[in-house]
Amino acid sequence: MIVNDASLERQQFEAAFDEFRALFPIALCYSKIVPVDEVVTLTLFHREDDHLKRLMLDGTQVAELDRLWEELRLVSESPLKEVDVFEQLYQFATQDADPSAFEPMREPIRREAVAFKKWLIELEPAQVSAVLDFATQAWRRPLVESERANLEALYESLRQQELPHAAAVRLLFARVLVAPDFLYRGEKATPGTKASPVNDFELATRLSYFLWASAPDDELRSLAAAGKLRDPAVLGAQTRRLMQDSRIRRLATEFGCQWLHVRDLETLDEKSERHFPTFAGLRGDMQEEAVRFFMDVFQNDRSVLSLLNADHTFVNGPLAGHYGFEVTAETWQRIDGLRAKGRGGILGFAATLAKQSGASRTSPILRGTWLSEVILGDKLPNPPKGVPVLPEEAPEGLTERQLTERHSSDERCASCHRRVDPFGFALEGFDAIGRARTKDAAG
């Protein structure tokens, strides 16, 4: 474009160019930006986020970004490394250039390194204090004065042995994490033989580990420190708060899935790939269905009866296809109307049905025993010695039910089988990986 130097058009073009440069970083205009000192560089971390800060982030986000850069500077100790890098750059660049061009850089780099080292020393007491604060979280209670003094003395002893600060702090962390107070959830009993209430910190630990399988958070610790957690209203409110948190997934996994014996289904490799080639790709989804179902029960305060008669479940696209359900998306979603499809509750999970089956066929005995012992709490005696193991596949001419009935006719086994087999036969409408069926492998 051709314009006169002093023309209005030139001013308009320059204003438009300035606006473009203000909105688009240079990286958008060039495929690659190569630093002049590409072989040996003095800049350890290049920051170019002015456009991001100015155009996209609010004040809080800018402050957080600046904090992260400062944290990177601290962790990397870049001002100290730049002293060594400068010497390498100086030796490299002055082989065929005038050294005087680089000398003005030496003193500012040295001054920044000296100031940074002084700052590191000033931070040492605060970092030791942070480890002690961490100990109160790790040990799930406030430190008593003797414990705090012992940890401080350990740090001082390590420094007197000429260990650098960073190494001494790492060992101090290790001391906190190998303490019995971290490794075990101990509760201090009162003298005598009578039962007594746990204190607030112990109650916070019980609640948090039961619901989250993890240590109490800041809010629980604060209430425990204030002596308020044993107030029934406060305890109830905190229980509901923890239940609504995403960490309740751990209760669904560690309690719900473990109770149903499907905690490890996602790694189950006992199914015959010849008979069930799709199982390996679905087993993780099967376990996830159980997790999401239990989370829904916990977070929505559903009736305990819904474990058996719920009319809904949670599936993604592949699992819905496995069940024969039609869904409009591949993502995880709730579906209703299961009872009309012959399912509902934990007895209709592919996870439970697959886990209590053999490698290539269903097992009414396994399913019935699981339902009797795990769901109903009716413990069965061990089977008598010498009872033959059922074949993995039903012999020709026998249905899977007939195979089970023939095995159960042994008088040594009949009393138990009369209790469990009807439960297992009731689930024969599902195959060994939980798909609905109207006939077994024998027809």
Feature locations, PLM:
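Low-complexity, glycine/serine/threonine/alanine-rich intrinsically disordered linker
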Residues: M1-G443
